[in-house]
């Protein structure tokens, strides 16, 4: 078994763990399988994990979209990284391809009504890329389980935090908060306490990615730079549409 494939699935499990635990997306209780795989990433478990990801009706279409444009598989390490953190693969996806994905994959019972999907597909902001921040800020939530209010958009967005204090079950981080001010989205600096999540070995002044106030993974400075870049790129694009 290719170690890169296992590493990719571990990363995918980390980013989808908390939203599934909250029952917002994916097969009910997939998070328990994800946690088990993160802690014991054995090759014989990979097929089941891959199948579970296919049940994520918002996430998996983006992975397929990015993969197809770059001639890779949906759960390739670079594809998973592109969607959650951001990398050069995103620039290979055309707006037309994103439009086709919205109409083909998001129009179904329990997701978007056709009228809303058409409206979204026809008005994709120029300069946007199919990063998780695009889904949060422009598509909002295809599931009716989550109300598209600012607090939820902020929580769902993958943010970052510089660790200032390590506690028993939480981390105090200097992070950012999504706000809506003067008719546009902005990121505002905010110190907050988050669940230490699945992160071990956290140290003061290291960086973590954050999803639903839950620490996802420790990230390097280049990952931090990419996450900021693609998040801010989509904020700028969506603001031009508002």
Model-assigned labels for residue ranges:
Residues 1-73:
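N-terminal low-complexity, intrinsically disordered tails enriched in Ser/Pro/Gly
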Residues 2, 27-29, 42-48, 55, ...:
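Serine/threonine-rich low-complexity intrinsically disordered regions
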Residues 39, 43, 54, 58, ...:
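Generic surface-pattern signal
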Residues 67-100:
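Long, low-complexity, serine/threonine- and charged-residue-rich intrinsically disordered N-terminal tails
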Residues 89-154:
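Anionic-ligand-binding alpha/beta catalytic cores of soluble enzymes and soluble regulatory domains
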Residues 157-160:
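Conserved beta-strand residues within beta-sheet cores
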Residues 162-242:
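C-terminal, beta-strand-rich globular interaction domains
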